[in-house]
Regions:
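Acidic catalytic/metal-coordinating carboxylates
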Residues: 38, 64-67
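Active-site T/S-Asp motif of two-component receiver
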Residues: 56-57
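Two-component/phosphorelay signaling modules centered on CheY-like receiver
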Residues: 9-34
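Receiver (REC) domain active-site loop signature in two-component systems and cognate sites
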Residues: 60
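Acidic, metal-coordinating helix/loop segments flanking the phosphotransfer/catalytic sites
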Residues: 35-53
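A short, hydrophobic beta-strand element within the central beta-sheet of small alpha/beta folds
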Residues: 78-86
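Conserved phosphotransfer cores of two-component systems
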Residues: 47-51, 71-78
Length: 86
């Protein structure tokens, strides 16, 4: 399982990563957690290898999470999308 954490705030990415890692460990599940500071960086990585799920911050500088989701859906309809905000 590959999970993307996309947020322009490093502290928010770190917090979500910790929470996800804790929940995965509690369930005995393994996943590759990757962090991205922009929608553009996430989409570039997704072209190389698809993600199982992506947590997208709605309000990011530049490309928003909603814009990244729309772009992703043009090529990948299977990735689970979860929208976040602070």
């Amino acid at each position: 399982m590959r999970i993307a954490i996309v947020d322009d705030l490093s502290g928010e990415r770190a917090l979500l990563r910790e929470q996800l890692a804790r929940q995965l460990a509690r369930r005995g599940a393994e996943a590759e957690l990757l962090e991205f500071d922009s929608g553009e960086a996430f989409l570039a990585a997704e072209k190389e290898r698809r993600f199982t799920a992506a947590f997208l911050d709605i309000y990011m500088e530049g490309m928003t999470g909603m814009e990244a989701a729309r772009a992703l859906r043009k090529t990948d309809t299977d990735c689970l999308l979860v929208f976040t905000t602070t």
